[in-house]
Regions:
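Multi-pass membrane proteins that catalyze or facilitate reactions on polyprenyl-/lipid-phosphate substrates
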Residues: 1-170
Length: 170
């Protein structure tokens, strides 16, 4: 999982490097991205540390949530197609998208899918919804990657082979 998250993090950062490295122009955007990332990072950390996330991880849960949230994404897209999307990403919309991302902690729920669904419910265009979803993923993927990497690095079960494997996958 750690290698997958690190790879995703690197891919998103490389793709959006112009937006990221133009920080002074986009300070407001980055503040909103940070705000929208906080809920899922905090709640996710709690679920991982308490082991609650593993209690609900099973094939039936994954199947039902994938179907349910796939339908929700489809409906949010279809019912909002007739209206023009917003260009501005407000603090209120950042908080709404951030809170809905907590649902992605359920097994079978895609974080990007729920973020796109939330943005479409707020009447964002498809392209803007996807861009917001990817930008919001940067701090989340960074946090998950860092946490996972540190767990492996400082684990008593961690062996030299595991660290080499992570280094190779970079």
């Amino acid at each position: 999982d750690v290698s997958l998250h690190i790879g995703s993090f690197i891919a998103v950062v490389l793709y959006f490097y112009k937006d990221i490295f133009n920080f002074y122009k986009n300070k407001d955007l980055f503040f909103k991205i940070f705000i929208s990332s906080i809920p899922v990072i905090l709640i996710g950390y709690f679920f991982v540390k308490t082991g609650e996330i593993e209690k609900i991880r099973n094939l039936e849960t994954i199947a039902w949530t994938t179907i349910l949230f796939g339908i929700l994404l489809y409906m949010s897209d279809k019912f909002k197609m007739t209206k023009e999307g917003k260009e501005s990403f407000s603090l209120k919309s950042a908080i709404f998208i951030g809170l809905l991302q907590i649902l992605s902690l359920l097994p079978g729920v895609s974080r990007s899918g729920i973020a796109i669904t939330a943005a479409r419910l707020l009447n964002f265009k498809r392209t803007d919804s996807a861009k917001i979803s990817f930008l919001i993923s940067i701090p989340i993927l960074g946090a998950v990657s860092g946490y996972g990497f540190l767990n492996i690095l400082f684990s008593k079960d961690s062996s030299f082979t595991q660290i080499n494997l992570i280094a190779i996958l970079f």
